[in-house]
Amino acid sequence: MGLGSSKPQHKKQLTIWRALHATRHTRYGLLADPLIGQSSTLQEECDKGLRKSLIRKRNGNMTPEGRRLQDGDQWDEWSDEEDEVGFPVRPRVPLRQITYKLAVDFSHFLKEKGGLDGIYYSDRRNKILNLYALNEWGIIDDWNAWSKGPGIRYPRCFGFCFKLVPVALHEEAETCERHCLVHPAQLHEDPDGINHGEILAWKFDPMLAVQYDPSREYFTDLYSTVGTGN
């Protein structure tokens, strides 16, 4: 037999249990810690859901900083999603040094997808190429190096079948207002950091996979620091 005080205590616990379960449920967004070690796709979906849950309806007469707009004032919304790159932000495969076979496969993949051949060179696009190779193929970004200019820039990675060739714009493109400031062809960017006044574009050359002669002119700079010891 139990004690006489056990029944009141049991009723008290039952009352508390009912009160807790009668409380309206609240949904909370996921924090970052539970996502560690999960796939990048899951993290992106959770991140989008969390950002949507944090969006509040904004008064049309208020700025994001809380300042009330006066008569005649306008505020234009903008989004930084336009600058987002459409691939994962972390490697999805094990990291590895590039090999001859991997360089050839990567080159032909880019050629078949049409994502590089004939594209104007720019520092931003070159960084995107490095990120894509790192995140999708696991290639460490020390492979993307070129011979010095001016003239054709050849890849120092044997097996990579793209080279940078100087191209000339037709007169209409040079005078068009759309190309004056934002077009990569007007930036005159060069992988060696020196402005040679050339407009460069990636060009696919399958012969780069079979022709490798260190004595050729574009490889001489690789041995410029090597002594001629006995």
From Swiss-Prot:
Topology versus the membrane: Lipid-anchor
Organism domain of life: Viruses
Region of interest called Acidic, as start-end residue ranges on this chain: 76-84
GO cellular component, one term: membrane
Subcellular location: Host cell membrane
InterPro entries hit by this protein: HIV-1_Nef_core_sf, HIV_Nef
Sections of the chain in a coiled coil: none
Span list, region Mediates dimerization: 127-143
Assigned protein family: Belongs to the lentivirus primate group Nef protein family.
Functional summary from the UniProt entry: Seems to play a role in optimizing the host cell environment for viral replication without causing cell death by apoptosis. Enhances virus infectivity and pathogenicity. Probably involved in viral immune evasion mechanisms.
Miscellaneous remark of the record: The 155 isolate is from a monkey imported from Kenya.
Protein name: Protein Nef
